[in-house]
């Protein structure tokens, strides 16, 4: 079993929650205030370490995931993300999907850190034209 921090549509009520269904929820948690949070094409969120600048604490859900299910979950993630280790606000560490360095270097993603989480961002912005609705399947955790 491994802790996995979800901060996108894999959370309860999200369109990709089925990928984690049945896995024990540890609880709602926040990252340490050391991360920037990005919207990738307004389709899914991405955490990235805030090196050399201010960071925010990002809200998500922590799950205790069996290793086989974690492997299966990784297969559903977008190519812009990779598995990384993050720090939580209480000093514990967890796996999470983070933005790849090469993606961050492009500078083409919207910084949504001030919203503090994906749900808050989605609630405040209409989906872009052609974007999937909240009940459409998506692989983003």
Task: Please describe what each predicted stretch is.
Residues 1-130, 134-137, 141:
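Glycine-aromatic micro-motifs
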């Amino acid at each position: 079993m491994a802790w996995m921090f979800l901060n996108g549509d894999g959370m309860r009520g999200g369109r990709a929650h089925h990928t984690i269904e049945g896995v024990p929820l540890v609880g709602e948690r926040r990252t340490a205030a050391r991360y920037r949070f990005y919207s990738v094409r307004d389709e899914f969120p991405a955490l990235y370490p805030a090196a050399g600048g201010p960071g925010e604490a990002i809200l998500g859900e922590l799950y205790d995931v069996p290793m086989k299910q974690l492997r299966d979950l990784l297969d559903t993630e977008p190519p812009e993300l990779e598995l990384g280790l993050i720090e939580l606000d209480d000093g514990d560490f967890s796996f999470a999907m983070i933005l790849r360095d090469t993606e961050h270097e492009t500078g083409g993603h919207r910084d949504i850190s001030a919203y503090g989480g994906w749900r808050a961002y989605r609630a405040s912005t209409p989906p872009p034209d052609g974007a999937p609705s909240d009940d459409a399947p998506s692989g983003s955790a």
